[in-house]
Amino acid sequence: MDLDLTEDQNTIRQVFADFFSSEAGPGRARGAEPVGFDPVAWERLQQTGAPGMGVPESLGGGGATLTDLTVVVEEAGAHIAPLPVVDHMVTARLLATVGACDDDVLTGAMVVGLAIRPPVGDMVRTVPTGAVASRVVALDGEVLLAVDGGPGTHLGNHGCLPLAHRPLKGATVLADGPDAVAAHSRALDEWRTLTSATLVGITRTALDLGVDYVKERKQFGRAVGSFQAIQHLLADLPGLLDGARLLTAKAAWAGDRAEAGQPGIADAGDNEITDFATLAGMALVVAGEAATLTTDRSLHVHGGYGFSEEYDIQLYFRRARALAVLLDDPARECRRLADLLLGPAQASGPPVSGPDANPESDENPEPHGKGEPYEGPDALVTGATA
């Protein structure tokens, strides 16, 4: 396993570090609040080819690997870019998988996003890009849906992310059955991996902000960074950053292997876990912990200034806290990982979603045709309209 970046990947890193340094950063993030989207910067990002770079070249994309994409989004996180880079990249790849990646998606002219949790009733709730995406892709049971209708109403949140609920009304079917479930599951693991890379970028900059501040801030005639109590707060953070970066790189590596048809191993008794779904979840948990602790400690050493809007660290603190819990409570993600490694625990109650949620449903529902209007899960069984 070689997790070192190639020469081409280092070039990608430098190109996008320069781009986000110019077109993103704390000033642009403040200007994009509260929705968390800068349309001018997004138009300029389109010129780099980033929105479609993860789509296969045979479909008009850039043919980038998942590892390539982690390089890009780490820089987006480091510069706290108010752009839906992760969600658009992941959703474009998913749409390409089911043969529905339009040119507007490839170029970024149409912003798309992924519903990271199943619908509740006739609504997909808390979609990460729901307030800016023209199309959201959601999985309802075994049916993969395209939810159009334009951006939803922004849900205020401390992280200033473009969250919104999106109604399923008017959704069309992209695919259904086990292949649709597998494609969405793969996309969700890619989302975990790229969100982890974003959190690594946030951690990196937050650590730099804290270290730079304690070098400059003087008290009692000395830089406060010379005091042991301050040093102890920051000393272990580089190790957390390295661990999060390592797991994220390993998850991306496993994802690229899986895409090439090389299955991984998920066995708690094995010293070398190579299963993509397992590593993606591990990376998200560890990167989330690293980002929340690092931004917390960095804000702490800023003293009262850390809480003021004029200082940049509060932007990273809020973004880290939001991203770390956006998918789910980290404790539940850890439980999911335990199920993957040790086998599922006995259920303590009825499932909340999926085909088993309706005990009366037919085991082999009539498949929906691609592009058909979606009439809700009941229509798969009874043919009734919603």
Residue ranges and their predicted role:
Residues 1-79, 187-365, 369-386:
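Alpha-helical interface subdomain recognition
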Residues 80-86, 93-208, 212, 345-386:
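FAD-binding core of flavoproteins
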